[in-house]
UniProtKB/Swiss-Prot annotation:
Coiled coil: 129-170
Key word Coiled coil present: yes
Lineage: superkingdom: Viruses
Stated name of the protein: Uncharacterized protein ORF33
Disordered: annotated segments: 165-187
Coiled coil is among the record's keywords: yes
UniProt keywords, alphabetically: Coiled coil
Amino acid sequence: MENNAAEIYGKFIINLARYIPPGTMIDTDFRDCMSRQMKLPPLYTSASKNVYDMTKALQNRGLISSKSIDQLFSAMIKYPTLHDVMKNTFVLAEQLLTEEENIASLSLLSLEDKASTPPPKEPTLSETVKELKDLIRTVADEHMKMKREHEAAMKELTLLINNQKQQQQQPVPMPRNSTATRPKNLAIPPRPLTNQYVCEGNKVKYIIKRGQDFVKFFDYIEDDVVKTPKFLYFLKKRFNIDLTNEQARSIHMGLIFQPIYNIDGDVTEIIKMIHDLGELSVYDRLLNEYVDKIVQ
């Protein structure tokens, strides 16, 4: 019966291997779990967990010995990929067989049905692309909304400043035949903000905000390990700016966390360059190119 159980186990392994692509790596946790015959971590498929459940069921029914289990699990931890594990475990299972064909205690068909349960559906490439493009569209919409709000605020400020100028330029009427003179110690009112100053100040804030939005998009889709190298590559390729990794990280983190009124000149210059590239059509095209690289 033990040999027949090994045959069932081997065929079960082959069914399980259908769900595992070649080259899938086994990590340390998986090796440890298999060697100790413990439950598998939840990040593996339900079919993978069935390896453990199936083995324990065979052992509990007295259909496979601890020695055979040790042989099977030892084989499974010798190979670098799950695909190799499944293939070589089946080879070992075949070596344990005899010519007996009786599998009376267990139904191979029911086991194969259990192993053939389809894995959870993964998102398709087109769905992933659609999700990323939706994100790009959202970023672009926010950009346009912010731009419209900025333009409306600028018009309002310009109108307010012009009204203040007109009021200050109107001469104060003096009474006729009056000997009154302007007091010498009268404080001179502060100069109002000029239109140019207001425009430039808001432009710098707007540029910095756009730079922050752009970098945050990269953070949204990048892993912590590659954020700074990606940003460094982006600056080199798009703007031909050579920076050290530490400089790039400092700028990168500064764009996200520093207040807009406390950014040094170097960072501001780079943000301006990002902004100059960031007209909507160019910005949208750049993000689309980036998405294409991800999904290739």
